[in-house]
Amino acid sequence: NYSCNTLRSGLMDGTINFATDTFYLALYTNAATLDQTTTAYTATGEASGGDYSPTGTQVTATVSTATTTNGSITYVNFSSPSWTGEITARGALIYKPGDNGAVCVLDFGADKTSTNTFTVQMPSNTSTSALLRLI
């Protein structure tokens, strides 16, 4: 899994705001080349099948802060999207539409195939397991 370079710069210059922006999760096959240098959504290598549509589906970001003995941790998690039908995907991209909106790349480690419902299960929304954590 990768946090994209555009996430870091977007947080610093205000172009990515988890509290107000709209985010999407797109699925990709093993033909996609996604990593921390990914800057935006791409149709190259995107998955298909079932009721999955190009560009993916909207996901809701939840921002929280927890106090620790060393200060505080702000963390962000996203809703767990699902699609019906047969879909095979190797990973996903969470992004804000437009240029330089890539947030993070999820690598499933191997192709995952569903025959009924394909769900990207996000981790628990806690300071120790949320998808993105700023310490």
Segments predicted by a language model, with ranges:
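Small cysteine-rich, disulfide-bonded extracellular modules of the LU/uPAR three-finger superfamily
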Residues: 1-90, 97-135
